[in-house]
Amino acid sequence: MALRVPALVLVLVLGAGRAAAGQGGGWETVREELGDAARDLVHVWVAPFRLGGDDLASLVILGEAFAIAALNDEAIRAWVEGNGHTPAVKAIRLFEEPRRVHRLGLTRHLIGLSAGLYVAGLATGSGDLREAGLGCAVSNLATTIPRSIVARTVGRLRPRYRRGAFVFEPWVGWRSWAYRSFPVGHGANSMACAAFLVERFDLGVAEPAVYLLATGIGLARVTKGAHWASDAVAGLAWGWAVGRGVGGRFLERAEAEGTLAGQAAEAHAAPRLYVGLRVEF
């Protein structure tokens, strides 16, 4: 991932630039939007330092959910292995590798799709397509970079090696995939993009489907034996928080631009002539 992500980001920038070259002001649009994207990354990464009392309840709920999952990791794993015939497990396994849908949890595929949306938005002049592509890319990068560092540093052993739920070898994850269980990656990546889209756009009846897709991708890593249930809880929650944060930033800018555009239109409106008639008796 260390080499793939920078390469894909470079493809995004170069592809956007090529599409922008044929449009007046295109390069300026790309420059401004990539600048906003960089600031969004920093904003998300320093978010833990802005936590206050209002966030305490959410943190407690998340902590309790993670603790419950962690204490039952081995029981959940045993139940999944012994109940593969149940409708619930069968449904989750529809998102497992090697089915193609699991690729929506991979950074390289999400960045590729994001680049395609962004370039298409530039080529067609669609701001919504550009925001969807860029926002998904930013949400994914803001999620996957720190998550990858945490996974490699914590060094939790994956369940498929059957040595128990609490086998940790700090730093070993930097050289061994087996010790990168916490937190889940596929689910965090897909959930970040899903949460961004839901926060930024009005998806209507599609909103539950988007969240269901991301959750299914995350849980499928549990049924696959690549992650513990608590890994999925942590990863999905992390992706959701990041995606909402990035989506909120995009939404604020869109609302501000809409307000300015409305004020400008009002200021440049054509003068109006009013004719009144008054009759006195």
What are these regions (language model features)?
Residues 1-3:
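N-terminal secretory signal peptides that target proteins for export/translocation
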Residues 77, 81, 120-121, 147-155, ...:
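Membrane-water interface at transmembrane helix exits
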